[in-house]
Amino acid sequence: MNDWLKYEKNGSVVTLTMNRPDIRNPLGEPEDVINFEEASKLVNDDRDVRCVILTGAGKAFSAGGNVLHILNIA
């Protein structure tokens, strides 16, 4: 994991927090997929996990796609 996608386990519950609150947690960077894949592997490999909560830091869950990134690759 990295600073953008935080992985926290409390008992059988894992909380994944998207942590770009200054820009409302957009998705779309290439490393976003890698981070979610890594988190999924950790969850799948841990037989104790019964629940995964996906949340966003700050005032918004997620603004959606990262428009700045999309404009840069178009």
Walk through the language-model features, giving the residues of each.
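Conserved CoA-thioester-binding segment of acyl-CoA-metabolizing enzymes
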Residues: 1-57, 71-73
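Short, active-site-adjacent cap segments at secondary-structure transitions
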Residues: 59-63
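Short, flexible, mixed-charge acidic loops at enzyme active sites
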Residues: 64-74
